[in-house]
């Protein structure tokens, strides 16, 4: 909480300065830490009751981090049920990075170029993963599959985006606000 308060104070004091990007980087780190707290709550490791942990994880994931708790819980449960099992673990599905030689061998175009250099490109690509995780979570909520507490998750996400994005885009010039958001997501 103190870190978020310091970021708000620092942002107000800096005004229209490109040093705001340092605040954005700090927020990226803080949101990552809150995401880890949501992870621990989802594993029921923080509070004494399961339902209380679920509520906390949903609040932290959706309301603070800005990612769908139900999407993450579904994906993470499948991962824990079948760790590193091809076709069952969503964490090793074909995406930008190939975990299997067969996937790398069948890659074409840009994905092939990335796959051939993925060892060198891993950390630069990691800067895009925050954006990817947010997009996948939103796609899950907007999808047709049943989502437990979809309305609650949408409400928390809307509140979170209003609290974070509206001040950034109202108080900073448009280009600086876009850079702020980009840095925050890259560090996340």
Segments from the language model and where they lie:
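Alpha-helical bilayer-embedded segments of polytopic membrane proteins, i.e.
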Residues: 1-34, 61-66, 119-130, 146-188
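Membrane-embedded catalytic scaffold of the fatty acid hydroxylase/desaturase
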Residues: 26-146
């Amino acid at each position: 909480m103190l870190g978020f308060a310091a970021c708000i104070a620092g942002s107000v004091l800096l005004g229209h300065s490109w040093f705001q990007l340092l605040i954005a980087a700090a927020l990226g780190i803080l949101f990552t830490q809150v995401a880890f707290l949501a992870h621990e709550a989802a594993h029921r490791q923080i509070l004494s009751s399961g339902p209380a942990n679920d509520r906390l994880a949903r609040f932290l994931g959706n309301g603070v981090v800005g990612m769908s708790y139900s999407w993450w819980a579904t994906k993470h449960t499948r991962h824990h049920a079948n760790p590193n099992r091809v076709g069952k673990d969503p964490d090793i599905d074909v995406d930008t990075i190939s975990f299997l030689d067969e996937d790398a061998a069948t890659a074409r175009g840009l994905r092939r170029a990335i796959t051939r250099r993925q060892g060198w490109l891993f950390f630069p690509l990691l800067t895009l993963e925050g954006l990817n995780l947010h997009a996948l979570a939103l796609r899950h909520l907007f999808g047709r599959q049943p989502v437990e507490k979809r309305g609650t998750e949408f409400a928390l996400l809307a509140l979170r985006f209003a609290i974070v994005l509206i001040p950034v885009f109202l108080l900073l010039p448009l280009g600086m606000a876009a850079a702020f958001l980009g840095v925050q997501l890259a560090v996340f």
